[in-house]
Amino acid sequence: MKTSGTVYVFLLLLAFGIFTDISSACSEQMDDEDSYEVEKRGNACIEVCLQHTGNPAECDKACDK
């Protein structure tokens, strides 16, 4: 009986460890996606600005680069 209790506790700790690893990996991936979206939007701003003005320095200022 004591062995089954020990196995049960071990399985609970293992499940908790796996859950925390997965949740931390997901949060890191979300941070990477957020930074990519900001970079993507910034590049789109510069592209549109360059199409209208043709002045890279002005576009850098306008797009906060």
Curated annotation (Swiss-Prot):
Disulfide bond annotation, renumbered to this chain? 45-63, 49-59
Q: Which residues form the propeptide?
A: 27-39
Q: What is its main location?
A: secreted
- Taxonomically, which superkingdom? Eukaryota
Signal peptide span: 1-26
- Give compartment(s): Secreted
| A molecular function (GO) term | potassium channel regulator activity
Q: Which residue stretches, if any, does this entry annotate as coiled coil? A: none
Query: Tissue specificity, please?
Result: Expressed by the venom gland.
**GO CC field:** extracellular region
* Record key words, sorted: Cleavage on pair of basic residues, Disulfide bond, Ion channel impairing toxin, Neurotoxin, Potassium channel impairing toxin, Secreted, Signal, Toxin, Voltage-gated potassium channel impairing toxin
- Entry remark concerning the domains of this protein: Has the structural arrangement of two alpha-helices stabilized by disulfide bonds (CSalpha/alpha 2(S-S)).
Similarity section = Belongs to the short scorpion toxin superfamily. Potassium channel inhibitor kappa-KTx family. Kappa-KTx 2 subfamily.
Q: What does this protein do?
A: Weakly inhibits the Kv7.1/KCNQ1 channel (10 uM of the toxin inhibits currents by 17.8%).
State what protein this is by name.
Potassium channel toxin kappa-KTx 2.7
Q: Which organism is it from?
A: Heterometrus petersii
